[in-house]
Amino acid sequence: MDYDPIKESLGRHFNRHPLLRKLFYLLLNILLLRSWHVRKALKKLSQTLPSSSKVLDAGMGFGQYSWWMARKFRGWNITAADIKSEQVADCNAFFRRERLGERFRAIEADLVRWTGTGKYDLVLCVDVMEHIEEDRKVFGSFFSMMNNGGYLVISTPSDLGGSDVHSENEKSFIGEHVRDGYSKAGITGKLLDAGFGKVSVSYTYGLSGSIAWKLSMKYPVIMLSASRLFFILLPFYYLAVMPFVILLNITDLNFSHAKGTGLLVIAEKNR
């Protein structure tokens, strides 16, 4: 199933007014479990990062993580890169309107070919690597872009049901994915080969998180792919399921998982 057309429709709708865009960011932070895990990791890393850190949001998408970081960590200077020119233009206009343009800029870039515009203390890469075939090249680029002692944070599907694939005969739920997910050993090995000195990988989307994903993402996407008329029903659907999704997300966030359909990866470049 192609997910990009649905994302683009949602993006255009919520980009009509700054308040709608802020509401969209809030909903993404609540509904997407990966956002909970990423924000928790960033809060922890912020205690060791410089207060004036230079940050790369690699594959920024709608820009919700850059928005959260720019408001949470007032000293951080953020560069956001994305391959889609429309999203780059939208983010730059929105951040300037919100008077954050001095600490944020979005640029159009293909991560496979782009080599950066400077050195970063933190590189954030959420829901990106499953779309890139030449992942080793990108990992190597990230390493070369980073300052010593910097961190790379990745959120990506695992090979244990990520992309909703549970057997060799199944196809990814998201048509744009070039791989169903990474194993812990696989992504660790690639990052070590790229030069990173320490790599930590933990499972996300355990049982409760997988249920939350189905309620918050899978079922709505299936409905919207069937007919755009379901956009009308979407607010009522989310009002009904949101309390359950929040509870499931909190549960997933606060327990460790022996296995899960997602991975949270933190790699450190040696000092």
Each model region followed by its residue ranges:
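S-adenosyl-L-methionine-dependent methyltransferase catalytic module, highlighting the catalytic core
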Residues: 2-41, 64, 83-87, 94, ...
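Glycine-rich helix-loop-beta junction characteristic of Rossmann-like nucleotide cofactor-binding loops
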Residues: 42-50
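Conserved beta-strand/loop positions that form the S-adenosyl-L-methionine
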Residues: 58
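Conserved glycine-rich SAM-binding loop
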Residues: 61
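Class I SAM-dependent methyltransferase SAM/SAH-binding core
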Residues: 64, 68, 75-111
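Short conserved loop adjoining the S-adenosyl-L-methionine
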Residues: 113-117
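A conserved beta-strand element that flanks and buttresses the S-adenosyl-L-methionine
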Residues: 124
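Hydrophobic adenine-recognition pocket in adenosine-nucleotide-binding enzymes
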Residues: 128
